[in-house]
Amino acid sequence: MKGYSIDKFPEKHARSRIREEDISVKDAVNIAHFLRGKKLESAKDILDNVMAKKTAIPYFRYLDSISHRKGIGPGRYPVKESKVFKKLLDDVSANAEFKGLSENLVIVSLSVSKGRMIKKFTPKAYGRAGAFFKDLVNLEVVVVEEE
């Protein structure tokens, strides 16, 4: 992961990035899809409600055996991933405050990509070992001041 996923940044923007976090790629993709385009403060409130298990994140991808929630369809409460996204949004909020941007910030880009893969082994019977792979996740966000 060299740079950001967008090439041209808007005039008044703030950005932040978290690299190689140990969270689920599938849950992170669904959270990013849900929060993209929302206001920054409203996105933080949504993540607080997800961590309190009051609001579910609607899933649009990776829907195998995902239970339906009342009013939104298939969804879950990914608490661990929500904590990481909350940290990311707090970081970009601090960056925007440092740049002197106002409080009216909108998330224009929120992307998730796979990071480094860690190869691990689990012991099996008869002295064998089975490999399993752990994907790490890169997150990045760009917010713009709304007029």
Q: What does each model-found stretch correspond to?
A:
Residues 127-147:
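C-terminal edge-of-domain segments
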